[in-house]
Structure formats: C-alpha cells, structure tokens
C-alpha cells in the first residue's frame, strides 16, 4: 500500500480509530500460554514414557513404545519453542504500532489546519491572506509527509513481526493399518462365533434326536447278563469241585483280599519305626576306632609268630631314590656298618620254621645280616618274609638248607654282574597275595613294589630270595 497517496486525515484517523495494540497483546499472551503448556506436556510425556520403559514395562514392546513416543515428545518441544517465538513477535508488533501511533499527526491538529485554511481563503478578498494560506498549506504538507513516513516504518516493522515460522503437523505414532487390522480381526472373530454357534446348534439337534429312553433298558440287560454269568460260573465250579465249590472259591478270594488289607495296615503301622531307623542310619556316625600302636619298621620286620617284636609301621619308599651298590639298588640301612654275616642255616641246619626263634636272631631283619643269608638262599626253611601294607608277616616254604654259608659280598658281586636278572613288580595291597602266589612258581629274583595311597611300599616275593 502506498501511504504517500493517502491524505494525513485518513492515515491519522485510521491509526486513532483502529483497535490499537490490545489484540496484539492478547495474542502475545495466548502464544505464551500455548508455549508453556506444550513445554509442560512434553516434559510430563517424556517422564512417563521413561518411567514405564525403565521400571514397570520392559521388553521389546516397551522399547517399541518408547521409540514411537520419542518423535512426538520432540515435536511438542519444538512447537513450544515456536509458540514462544510467535509471542515475542506479537510483542514486537505491539512496539511497532505504538511507535507509529506516536509518530503520526493527531487528527485534531490536521482538522485545525484545515479549518484555518478555510477561514483564510474565505477572508482573502484583497489577497492579504496569501502568505498565511501558503504557510497553512506548507504545514499541511509536513503533516502529510510525517504520516507517510510513520506508516511506512510501521508497515516494515509489522511485516517483520508478523512473519512466523510455519508449524508442522504432529508425527504419526500409531500404525495406520491398525484400524483395518482390528476390523479384520473383529470380522474373523464374528465368523468364528457364527461357526461355533452352528456346530453347537447341530450338536443340540443331534442330542435331541438321540433315543435316551433305551439307556435304562441297556443297563438292565447288562445287569441281567452279569447275574446269569455269575450263576453259570457257580454251577460250573460246583459241578467240578462239589456242591460247595463255588462257596469255597468265593471265601478263598475274600480271605486273600482280607490278607492284603492286613498287609496295608502293617505297612502303615511300621512306617514310623522304619522312618526312625532310616534317619538313624543316615545321620549316625560310629565313634572313631582306636589306632593300634605299631613299632618302627626297623624293630619289627621279622616273623609275626616269633621273629617280630610287634606290628611294624607301614614302610614308605621313594621312586628312584634308593642307594646303589654298583648297579644294584639296596635299602638305606645297608649303608651303615653291619656285623659279620651269620647264617640262620648254619645255626639250625636241620630244623624247621618252629625252631627259628631259638636262633636268638634279633627281631630286626637286618640284625646279624640275616638278610644276606636270605638273599643267598641259606636260610632255607627258616622264614622268608613278605611285607603287607599294615605290617610284616612271613610264612615258610619247605626246602633243603644250604650246604654251606654264602657270603653277602659274593651275592652282591653276582647281582652287580647281572643287574637285569632282578624283575620288578608294582602292585597294590589288595593284589599283593595273589602276585606273591604267582611269583612263587616262577624262577628268578623278583622285587615287588607295593603301593598304598601316595606312598609306595616294597615287599619281597613269597619265596627264598636265592631261588625266586
């Protein structure tokens, strides 16, 4: 609009006669309220969705709900900001209007100028008012220019203030095909209900046509047939076993049934004692048995019936840690000084095992180098010893005593020349007796290694060392 073509009376009149800044202020307040409401709604919406997704509602459906609600929360926050901007622009328009209203010439001044001009023109008979008329017209022109400039400034400011950012529609947070799917499901359910009603109607019709009157007759016939069968079986048993056969047969089975009833009562009566005995067996632990004192290994490796001073403690051994005499592995006690060899066979050359204690050989197996005699076979029938896991025991095998003593040095020298002649056997306590029985029938020199738990034990074969 070209405000330069419009006289100041109209321009000023429109500014003074218009609604003023009231509507723009009301619009600014409304935009402010909308912005605050949208912001509050967005915060509440986000809080509710977050609380449901993290506490009361978990799983894939909860994640889908949160993902669908997030764009709507974003839209509300953005729209709230736009509403706040619109309120600010409305207030800017109010400021522009107030500025333009103050800049335009008030209509009373314009009316006074026009009245003065009319008066001067009416009294200008001789031209004496020509200067006054020109001054009045000049003043009017200034008013026109002032109103024109004020309106152009107001138009520019109001155009900027009224240029708002376009609002967008809220995003779609639901499935558009949900209504169609719901309608289809409703139709399917209706059809299924119709089919069910049809089936129910058909069954009701068939039930109405069924002849229920014949059921009592059928039941009565079955009862009669059962009675006739019982009578027939009774007559047959009486014909085979005599006139009281059926009664005896019936009493027999009644007695058997009563016996089973008594067994049930007995089971019920014994359930409590059985429970107590079961609990006693499960939780009762026997008191620890006293340990049998055992003498040391060196003090009791002789015969249990007289050569030993008592039960020997379990012997322990280490693999690959024995002393060596040349290539021969020997017990650790062989390294100590020993007395001269005195053979048991020389002491009692013609006696048996019962006379072995009379030789006064110490209980220690290594005392007086009896082991040397046993190694050479000179002990004969005295007492070749074997060793079990709990101690030492011996039994004698018959044989002929050696004709002459055998020196220990000669036996050791012979074993050094033939280190491979000694056969080693590994066995546990349970299989020791069986192994010794088998080795007693095999010639050669055998070394039996007995294992008991983590500590292996060594036992000599159940024969004379000189022959097996």
Swiss-Prot record:
- Annotated stretches, region: Disordered: 447-468
Q: Which InterPro entries match?
A: PPE_C (IPR022171), PPE_dom (IPR000030), PPE_sf (IPR038332)
BP terms from Gene Ontology = response to host immune response
Assigned protein family = Belongs to the mycobacterial PPE family.
**UniProt name for this protein:** Uncharacterized PPE family protein PPE33
Organism of provenance: Mycobacterium tuberculosis (strain CDC 1551 / Oshkosh)
Name the lineage.
Answer: Bacteria, Bacillati, Actinomycetota, Actinomycetes, Mycobacteriales
- The gene that this protein is the product of is PPE33
